[in-house]
Amino acid sequence: VTGSLPTGTELAMALAAMLLNSAAMIALKIMLDRHVGAELRKAMPGKAWLPGVLTGTVAVSLFFVSMVYPPTGIYLPGIKYKYLGVFTANPFHNATYMAARPFAILAFFKYAELMPLYEQDNAHKEYGRDYILFSVYLLLATMAKPSFTIVLVGAAGILMLWRMFHSKFRNFMPTIWLGVCFLPTFADLLYQFRGVFVPQEGQEGGIGFTLGHVWLQYCSNLPLAIGLAVGFPILVLLLNYKELCRDSIYRFSWQIYGMSFLMAFCLYEKGFREMDFNFSWGYMYGIFFAFVGALLVLLRATGKADTKKKKGLAAIQWLAYLWHLVCGLYYFWGFLQGAMYY
């Protein structure tokens, strides 16, 4: 038994992943408290302890949700595997994904917080500390695993360019100042991806364009796969769609998901890396932040639920979340029993 325990490099990687994943839970708890804590305390007078317990429970539980899947032996149409082709917010088998997550969470929230502010006059001076923190968080996430960064940069770039054209370049300098925060990350991305664009072993290199070709090798029913992966966020969106206009963080969470889906569906690495489907890692970050945004909205809606109808709708949404959580706990238990991830 002793010989089967991880030692040396493996043990160090396992401990680092555990500590960083724990840090991600703490980071998410802090962000939930910051953005919905006050509203929950207002909605729960006389129970000062309850909002903190609620956000803490939600923060920890989110790291155990997974895709929804049927019991063993039952197969859904077009779904070949439990994980492959469907994907999950928590790929427990990938240490670098988990290691990058605390920095990804902090970078996501910091950028979402800056979005309503960066176009103000002298925002880069007034919020200079936030600009620096965002740049550092994004760089650290990139150094651990660049998959999240590619998605965030894509979504943020389109959003900032659209705002700049819409304002007829009146916000040109504020856009440049916020763009400077991305420069350290761009340098690291160029270093990490230099091998992708260099042909190896006589094979073509670079990034190719497709329409789901790689994804369809693992799953032939993409609509169902999407529903199994983000069923809970989709339900919250359908019942709270007006929050997209009111809540910039919630809106940005869906922009992140949308960009991650487009990249996974339309892009692939040429050559021997094609079937590795490395753009799926960015998609899994998109799934994770779709859950984060949905939980922010649901926590807020739960606190405001003052009628039987609103309480019933909140309960339905929590049951959908519980479904993902039960599947995730069973999926995690399978890992502990030696089951394969796919």
Label each region the model flagged.
Residues D130-P146, L152, G157:
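Membrane-interface alpha helices of multi-pass inner-membrane proteins
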Residues L5-I26, A48-G52, G56, N94-M98:
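Loop-to-helix entry region of an early transmembrane alpha helix in multi-pass inner-membrane enzymes
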Residues L50-M115, N221-I226, F277-I287:
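Membrane-interface micro-motifs in multi-pass membrane enzymes
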Residues A23-M31, L106-E113, A155-R163, I234-L239, ...:
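Transmembrane alpha-helices and membrane-interface helical segments
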Residues E113-L139:
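Short hydrophobic alpha-helices at membrane interfaces in multi-pass membrane enzymes
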Residues L15-P45, V60, L106:
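Transmembrane-helix motifs of polytopic, lipid-linked glycan transferases
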Residues L152-F182:
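Perimembrane helix-loop-helix junctions
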Residues L183-L189, R194-Y342:
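Transmembrane helical bundles and short interhelical boundary loops of multi-pass, membrane-embedded
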